[in-house]
């Protein structure tokens, strides 16, 4: 495959999107443009090429994507379905590579495919795979496991906000975790290795760690805090989520236990057995990085 030069990012404003955007621009390897809806008010750095299009119109999107080599979708859960139009527009405009909004659990694991947060992602994968068979569009799925720094800062992997973090299933299960910087560098790696990453999943990671490991690091950084961890099980957490779902309540509180299942339950493959950092030229961060994140958070 010829080199990828012109890259469009859709969803460049979120935590991951902003990091990927900056990393692509700073690499100096690509001409980067941001695609957004006409009513978007998000501001980007001076000099950023921003194109607007009606996301309900494949023709409008195809016009916006004319001359582009790759499209990176970094969309939130509510916007995942828009990728169908983006895929169709990419094919119509001759885009070579489409990277969908994955960046999470390993969706080759059959148990993950049944979890609420991943249902639409699985459908998009099927749609993209089918479309690629009858067109020149190729794809790469990027699996990262849990976001490391974001997961710490947002109290997602371990809620230290009141020094009473909830530990699931004993807290010893090791899981793959990836910092936002490493995810972004992985995207650069995919785009600079188009043949090696064609029509396949790639696996990124920094540190394999457990909740108990994270708690130990937090205690090391802040030994004088009144630490009192609480224990529960994934079964209890997902049972409560099932009840909320049955009541028609679909919010972050409902979704989180299913995400924890994908991370902390060994049957869901959160402890990745594959890693493509070396292939993509992406260095790994270590536990010192985690200490730095906690030192800042718990200061």
Tell me the role of every PLM-derived stretch.
Residues 1-6, 295-299:
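Eukaryotic N-terminal low-complexity, Ser/Thr- and Lys/Arg-rich leader segments
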Residues 2-45, 56-59, 80-81, 93, ...:
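Oxidoreductase cofactor-interface core, primarily capturing Rossmann-like NAD(P)-dependent enzymes
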Residues 49-69:
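Conserved Rossmann-fold cofactor-binding substructure of NAD(P)-dependent oxidoreductases
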Residues 62, 180-188, 283-294:
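Short, amphipathic alpha-helical "lid/cap" segments that border enzyme active or binding sites
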Residues 65, 69-74, 99:
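N-terminal Rossmann-like NAD(P) cofactor-binding module of classical short-chain dehydrogenase/reductase
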Residues 78-86:
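Beta-loop-alpha module in the N-terminal Rossmann-like domain of NAD(P)-dependent dehydrogenases
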Residues 89, 94-105:
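ADP-ribose/adenylate-binding Rossmann-like module
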Residues 234-299:
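A hydrophobic C-terminal alpha-helical subdomain
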């Amino acid at each position: 495959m010829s080199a990828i030069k012109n890259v469009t990012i859709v969803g460049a404003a979120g935590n991951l999107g902003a990091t990927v955007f900056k990393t692509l621009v700073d690499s100096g390897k690509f001409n980067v443009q941001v695609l957004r809806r006409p009513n978007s008010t998000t501001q980007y750095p001076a000099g950023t090429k921003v194109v607007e299009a009606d996301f309900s119109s494949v023709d409008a999107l195809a016009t916006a994507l004319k001359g582009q080599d790759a499209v990176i979708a970094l969309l939130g859960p509510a916007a995942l379905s828009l990728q169908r139009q983006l895929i169709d527009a990419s094919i119509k405009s001759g885009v070579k590579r489409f990277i969908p909004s994955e960046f999470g659990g390993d969706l080759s694991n059959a148990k993950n495919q049944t979890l609420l947060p991943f249902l639409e992602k699985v459908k998009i994968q099927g749609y993209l795979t089918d479309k690629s068979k009858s067109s020149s569009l190729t794809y790469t799925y990027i699996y990262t496991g849990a976001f490391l720094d974001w997961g710490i800062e947002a109290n997602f992997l371990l809620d230290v906000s009141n020094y009473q973090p909830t530990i699931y299933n004993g807290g010893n299960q090791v899981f793959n975790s990836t910092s936002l910087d490493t995810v972004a560098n992985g995207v650069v790696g995919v785009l600079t290795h188009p043949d090696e990453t064609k029509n396949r999943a790639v696996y990124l990671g920094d540190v394999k760690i457990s909740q108990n490991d994270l708690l130990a690091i937090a205690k090391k950084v802040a030994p004088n805090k009144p630490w009192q961890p609480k224990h529960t099980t994934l079964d209890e957490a997902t049972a409560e989520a099932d009840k909320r779902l049955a009541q028609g309540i679909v919010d972050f509180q409902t979704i989180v236990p299913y995400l924890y299942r994908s991370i902390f339950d060994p049957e869901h493959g959160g402890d990745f057995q594959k890693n493509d950092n070396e292939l993509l030229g992406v260095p790994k961060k270590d536990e010192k990085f985690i200490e730095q994140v906690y030192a800042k958070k718990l200061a």
